């Protein structure tokens, strides 16, 4: 058995060996196939999956700012500098700044002290090599890079109603105020060389022309759409408040800068000295200055007419009965002037607000004119023409000749009593109401009354118990002329 086992054992042990070798050989042959498949799969998968982005490069490190040693943001105008010193140098060059050192012109410039002395900071900018030409070239480059936007002017068209309004106002202005080219100019040698307090000859001529101008202004007002629909009281209030504004505006549009003269409606041409001697006095230079300010506006007759209408129809005047109606009439005038002015000057949209600003200037001149009228009344020998007196002077400065009389009527004396005006103010300060204002009601038409009775102010057209007009109420000159001569309806 042992021999059999001994003989059998090697056979049994040997038999599997070839199989294992064969398997190993087969395995060795098969290995490259496996490797190539894996490699092919890996390659195809790499092609399908995108590769991850490469890491960003490290930030670029610049040398500290050559001027203040702060952290640099790059090379600006030739040197490494921070944003602060870059902007400071650019502004200094572009605006041609001139700085002053309050010490010895050798201040230390660093991150902390750089804002203390601009002179030394700019000097150090030049010392470290910043280039002035680089600033200018950079500025020109930006101008070339920026595309110029073509801004087309807005199209302004008047509606049918506004077009009709403009035509009516323009026609009313032209028919009551001839243009300078339509006048035959003539001059006078009266006191043309030196200023005097008052030239009576020029004053007589000027007062005559002013009265005619006032009549033309009333005629102009009547032609404005909607003006005669206002109450008579409001028409008179607006005329008295704006008459001097329109008068000054009209005469200033006839200013000739080459000769420094102004021309009136009949062609009379006066220089600055003659205007002073004719009664303008200290108001002369103010009027001529305003006339010079109108020249750049280059207003035509239509714009002058619209601006005159805006001055006249203004709801902020005192003692108006229906200010809201006046405002309603003014709104289309403002809109018409805005559209007309911008349509006439599409590239100058600021002209309309500049025109409106002249209304404020005119009111200032009118206030000075009313003050001048008071002193002028004391200089002229005779009475002032009634229309001029009514337009230029505040009716409250006139005194009644007597506080009361038997008939109950009080006559108005057309002369200002400055002393009495001071007494009135003193009485108000003491809390005492003067006799002439006792019983006065707020909101009444006291501004248009001319008579007083028993120390009580009465309304101009207030009826008594029998329904008739009270005997003591005399019509003012403006009221009578407005209703009769000019037929204000």
From Swiss-Prot:
Region Disordered: start-end pairs: 37-57, 398-489
UniProt keyword Acetylation, yes or no: no
DNA-binding span(s): 62-137
GO annotations of cellular component type: nucleus
Statement: the UniProt record of this protein carries the keyword Zinc-finger: yes
Pfam families: Hormone_recep, zf-C4
Membrane-spanning ranges: none
UniProt family annotation: Belongs to the nuclear hormone receptor family. NR1 subfamily.
Function field: Receptor for retinoic acid. Retinoic acid receptors bind as heterodimers to their target response elements in response to their ligands, all-trans or 9-cis retinoic acid, and regulate gene expression in various biological processes. The rar/rxr heterodimers bind to the retinoic acid response elements (RARE) composed of tandem 5'-AGGTCA-3' sites known as DR1-DR5. Required for hindbrain development.
Name recorded for this polypeptide: Retinoic acid receptor gamma-B
Gene that this sequence comes from: rargb
